[in-house]
């Protein structure tokens, strides 16, 4: 079997049928679909079961208690039987010619990985690599992949990667990282990119990503921060390996600082957020950074003047000022949006 299409499923009853239909209508047919239901509380599991009964030779399903998408992905990997794996999120869908296009590249180049573009609801095309046109990237040229992966430039999505299963470590126990609920794609991709020797890039959009609001950040801002902290530590390990004497280390720290400010902004903007809870959250981050001073030492280059200002207020411990300034900026943005 050539392809295993892996779907982590959780509460996607509105979209899972469209997702599965887009795979079942592929022009290339040597594939299996592996669905891992992460304890859905809606009708997602029931809908998936109905498809499995209709296509038992193609679809396999694992139902389990909720443990988060990272551990769900690990189960899907262990269930996969295809020579190559690719991911499809349960609320997204793929273009009808994706598998055929991947097959042609495998026949021609037998790569360890194929990367392609995706679109969002806005019909905006996101280029996974900042390279014009199709290309083959050999091991000696992988620094371009490393930089774009670590600096967060549209390459962190698992859903735009077709990966040779033999280069993926499926046996390592990830249970210690079950708290990683944000950025799990990047967490999974780092060792895979490291192991890939030949990578094909297709400058075509084969994947449609639906923007669905999530409550992960809003329900537990510190969990969001904890995820980013773990991912940053993993990034730093690979950065040391890939660029032992390179200044890119500071750029990665800038990306991490931006993620942390994102968490603080989301926390402050959460509905019915009490100031007391917000202050507790920010102080927890500061306590953590006191123990791990990578973020708090030195100036960071953040993507906007507003975020630079947030960052300075955070470092100076002006937590209340930061809270009210975030609220003010959000109100101004909302007014502009409704004009």
State where each predicted segment sits.
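Short, well-formed alpha-helical segments that are part of the catalytic scaffolds
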Residues: 11-25
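A conserved acidic beta->alpha catalytic loop
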Residues: 22, 37-46, 67-68
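Short beta-strand/loop segment that forms part of the nucleotide-sugar
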Residues: 31-39, 60-65, 89-90
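Glycine-rich, basic loop-to-helix element that forms the pyrophosphate-binding segment
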Residues: 64-80
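Short aromatic/hydrophobic "clamp" motif used to bind/position activated sugar donors
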Residues: 85
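Donor-binding/catalytic cores of nucleotide-activated saccharide
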Residues: 90-199, 207-210, 214-220
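Catalytic core of nucleotide-sugar-dependent glycosyltransferases
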Residues: 206-212, 218-247, 258-292
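Membrane-interface aromatic/basic loop that binds lipid-linked glycans or pyrophosphate carriers
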Residues: 269-339
């Amino acid at each position: 079997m050539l392809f295993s299409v892996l779907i982590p499923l959780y509460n996607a009853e509105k979209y899972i049928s469209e997702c599965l239909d887009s795979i079942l209508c592929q022009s290339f047919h040597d594939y299996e679909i592996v669905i891992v239901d992460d304890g859905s509380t809606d009708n997602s599991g029931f809908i998936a079961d109905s498809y499995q009964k209709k296509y038992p030779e193609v679809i396999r399903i694992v139902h389990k208690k909720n443990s988060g998408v990272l551990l769900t992905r690990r189960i899907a990997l262990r269930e996969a039987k295809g020579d190559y794996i690719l991911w499809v999120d349960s609320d997204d869908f793929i273009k009808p010619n994706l598998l055929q296009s991947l097959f042609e590249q495998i026949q021609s180049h037998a790569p360890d990985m194929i990367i392609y573009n995706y679109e969002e609801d806005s019909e905006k095309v996101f280029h996974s690599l900042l390279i014009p046109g199709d290309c083959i990237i050999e091991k000696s040229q992988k620094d371009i992949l490393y930089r774009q992966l670590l600096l967060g430039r549209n390459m962190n999505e698992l859903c735009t990667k077709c990966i040779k299963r033999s280069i993926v470590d499926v046996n390592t126990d990830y249970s210690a990282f079950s708290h990683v609920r944000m950025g799990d794609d990047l967490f999974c991709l780092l060792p895979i990119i490291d192991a890939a020797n030949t990578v094909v890039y297709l400058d075509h959009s084969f994947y449609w990503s639906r923007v669905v609001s999530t409550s992960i950040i809003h329900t537990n801002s510190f969990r969001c921060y904890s995820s980013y902290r773990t991912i940053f530590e993993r990034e730093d390990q690979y950065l040391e390996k890939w660029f032992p004497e390179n200044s890119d280390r500071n750029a990665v720290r800038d990306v991490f600082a931006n993620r942390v400010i994102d968490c603080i902004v989301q926390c402050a903007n959460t509905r019915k957020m009490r100031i007391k809870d917000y202050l507790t959250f920010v102080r927890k981050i500061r306590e953590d950074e006191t123990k791990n001073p990578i973020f708090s030492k030195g100036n960071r280059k953040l993507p906007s003047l507003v975020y630079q200002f947030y960052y300075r207020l955070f470092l100076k411990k002006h937590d209340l000022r930061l809270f009210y300034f975030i609220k003010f900026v959000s109100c101004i943005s909302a007014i502009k949006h409704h004009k």
